[in-house]
From Swiss-Prot:
Its EC number is 4.2.99.18. Changing residue 138 to N: 100-fold decrease in activity and 4-fold increase in substrate affinity. [4Fe-4S] cluster binds at residues 187, 194, 197, 203. Monomer. The gene is nth. This is Endonuclease III. It comes from Escherichia coli (strain K12). DNA repair enzyme that has both DNA N-glycosylase activity and AP-lyase activity. The DNA N-glycosylase activity releases various damaged pyrimidines from DNA by cleaving the N-glycosidic bond, leaving an AP (apurinic/apyrimidinic) site. The AP-lyase activity cleaves the phosphodiester bond 3' to the AP site by a beta-elimination, leaving a 3'-terminal unsaturated sugar and a product with a terminal 5'-phosphate.
Amino acid sequence: MNKAKRLEILTRLRENNPHPTTELNFSSPFELLIAVLLSAQATDVSVNKATAKLYPVANTPAAMLELGVEGVKTYIKTIGLYNSKAENIIKTCRILLEQHNGEVPEDRAALEALPGVGRKTANVVLNTAFGWPTIAVDTHIFRVCNRTQFAPGKNVEQVEEKLLKVVPAEFKVDCHHWLILHGRYTCIARKPRCGSCIIEDLCEYKEKVDI
């Protein structure tokens, strides 16, 4: 895909959604961090249902520590992998209190040192909480970038590297959100909704379907 096509795709996505954001509910960097930790192999809807009950009780590292692992589990049992997630949350809260004055660090290395936090989670937090021009690549974005040929790659690392290289600076902060929403609602895994796609004429997917 050439530069002009990519620019037009990003321009249309921006025109369609000028102020995109995550569908996870949060009101602080800490709430976002916990929500993203919970979102692995879970839907944003299921995470939001759990945090709607959890956050009124505990939305700081200290309050979460008071709940303890078993206490956290009672609020997140509807989410997959809740046992390991509860343990990671408590370990993370302890580190935040002991090493970061109870604050979520605006630092990639410090974030990735937290239990359960990998590059993708760190990218989401840095981008959505702190406005960094990072681009977290999940399954939706991986699919969209390969299917459209916007930024093809054999794995998420290659796709992220390509995106950071080809996406102009003015689009970088919002790019993650545009692509994930496009993959979640239009360029879906099975039977993509090409007929209602705003970038269908620019897409290089060879098996486009007019639905």
